[in-house]
């Protein structure tokens, strides 16, 4: 089974390491035909205890020039209902403390169409409120009635979970016009290739049932390669 690429045009929602929480691994690529249990390690690297909520969710992809061509794609590719996490809530994770969270992915039903499916594990850390002493008042601030307050913030993180069912089949069309390259992926599997524009190269990944339009300066020489084989060339 091919490995999935965890970011779509640099805009897929990759897991983040920030001031409160470290998460490993940062993505999962799982087999659709087998029920599996995986481990996730979370670590609180802030200076105060946090409460951590974890749950499987689906998130739509939004990017400039990207359109999903399947109106029901949310239902088509969403596997959040096949994922369970334990524990779903860690009531207190102390500074520098690590905990193991287990992800259970159930095998997809045999009658589900071949294709690629995805969901995300949503991690929501919230700093736990703590009492402030009188010595803290100058550093932490005071409210209008003289009582101490502390402003806490949290940043959600997302770990992608990908599943591929069946043998990959490609159904992609290319169009060059009006200074734009348009790639339409009508298949149920993601499309990936190397995009060359003049002297610049980048990895391009397009999700299933999606169309992407990218604009370039007039006269740009554009080519798409996959496994060193030319897929399409044009001059805009």
Task: Identify the role of each PLM range.
Residues 14-16:
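N-terminal signal peptide c-region/cleavage motif recognized by signal peptidases
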Residues 19-50, 90, 169-176, 184:
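Beta-sheet-dominated interaction scaffolds and their linkers
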Residues 24, 33-39, 99-100, 112-120, ...:
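Short, solvent-exposed loop/turn segments enriched in Ser/Thr/Gly
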Residues 46-48, 109, 127, 184-189:
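Short, acidic/polar linear motifs in exposed loop/turn regions
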Residues 50-78, 187-201:
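Short acidic, flexible loop segments centered on an aromatic residue
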Residues 55-61, 70, 106-168, 220-236:
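Terminal connector regions
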Residues 72-110, 198-223:
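Intrinsically disordered, low-complexity Pro/Gly/Ser/Thr-rich segments with frequent PxxP/GP/PP motifs
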Residues 170-236:
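Intrinsically disordered, low-complexity segments enriched in serine, threonine, and glycine
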